[in-house]
Amino acid sequence: MSGMYPQPLMMMPQQQRRPRKPRTKSAPKPPTTSKMSEKTKKEVTKSTMSTEKQIPMPTIPAASKGSLKDLDVRNNLNQQELNGIYYDTVNNLNACHGRMIFQPTGGSLTEGTLTVTIKLRVKSDQCLKMCSAFHKRNTNLETPLSAVDISKESEKSLGKD
């Protein structure tokens, strides 16, 4: 019965394995679209990796450059448009679980422009908590934009970068 199984011709010497390199903790990488599902891809491309929205300023004629009234955002956008921009930014924040950074040029939203930067989150519970807390506080669109003091809100919820 020894002819049933072929005998190995020669035992190959086993090669020694190289020791593994010790893993070092590297900085977390931003999400890549190749590993994402289609739904997530759409959300990321829709909100983009870093989205900036700036409330447009009116063009100022040379004759009235000295007048600050022409610089007022409220002369250029009505309340509904302001609420729309605000709603979009909150939605983008919610879609990408990011951080929203407000940069008002004046002391509050009633003065000057407001730049909103949305950044995708690094995996962190603290960041998610901040986002959800911010979102819960600011989803009420009945509150006019000018009544919300964004500069103080951002310091409380986001901390210093």
From Swiss-Prot:
Its main location: virion. Residues 17-26 have a biased composition (Basic residues). GO terms for molecular function: RNA binding. Residues 36-45 have a biased composition (Basic and acidic residues). Residues 1-16 have a biased composition (Low complexity). Keywords: Ribonucleoprotein, RNA-binding, Viral nucleoprotein, Virion. One of its GO terms (cellular component) is viral nucleocapsid. It is found in: Virion. Residues 1-52 are annotated as: Disordered. Belongs to the torovirinae nucleoprotein family. Major structural component of virions that associates with genomic RNA. This is Nucleoprotein. It comes from White bream virus (isolate Blicca bjoerkna L./Germany/DF24/00) (WBV). The lineage of its organism: Viruses, Riboviria, Orthornavirae, Pisuviricota, Pisoniviricetes.
